[in-house]
């Protein structure tokens, strides 16, 4: 094993230990079984190479967003924001059980939430397309949201 692999394994062990400590905090009120389930889902997401861009360079966690769009105040916290020279990706984690099978099954509330985030982030990164996706922790699976449907929800919310 080379030094880089050893360092990566050490980082993985530290991440898992930190997650265990966090979940075990009595203030969360999580039973042991729930802690194990959440930990397993979280580690599966982080270990899946398909999600590497969401957690790699250029990505940020828990990004607060606030703005006034078409006279309406929009605020929230983006779970992951990936900023690249040619695009921006907004990712929100969802834990629905079972997760929706298709875009048509995604609750309207999530569409509105992501449409609002997209409108706010679009004011900052107006020179780049802003994409949105939901990361379902069960599976795990990344579901990119259709821009046309996001646009429709933004119109319904009076954000355009």
Task: Identify the meaning behind each predicted range.
Residues 1-160:
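Structural signature of nuclease core domains in nucleic-acid processing machines
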């Amino acid at each position: 094993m080379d030094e880089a692999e050893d360092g990566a394994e050490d980082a993985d062990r530290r991440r898992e230990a930190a997650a265990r400590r966090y979940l075990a905090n009595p203030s969360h009120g999580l039973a042991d079984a729930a802690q194990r389930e959440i930990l397993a889902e979280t580690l599966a997401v982080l270990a899946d190479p398909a999600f590497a861009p969401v957690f790699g360079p250029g990505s940020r966690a828990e990004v607060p967003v606030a703005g006034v769009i078409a006279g309406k105040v929009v605020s929230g916290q983006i779970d992951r924001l990936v900023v690249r020279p040619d695009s921006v990706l907004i990712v929100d984690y969802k834990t629905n059980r079972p997760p929706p099978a298709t875009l048509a099954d995604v609750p309207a509330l999530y569409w509105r939430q992501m449409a609002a985030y997209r409108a706010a982030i679009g004011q900052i990164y107006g020179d780049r397309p802003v994409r949105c996706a939901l990361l379902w922790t069960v599976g795990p699976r990344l579901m990119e949201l259709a821009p046309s449907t996001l646009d429709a929800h933004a119109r319904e919310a009076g954000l355009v």
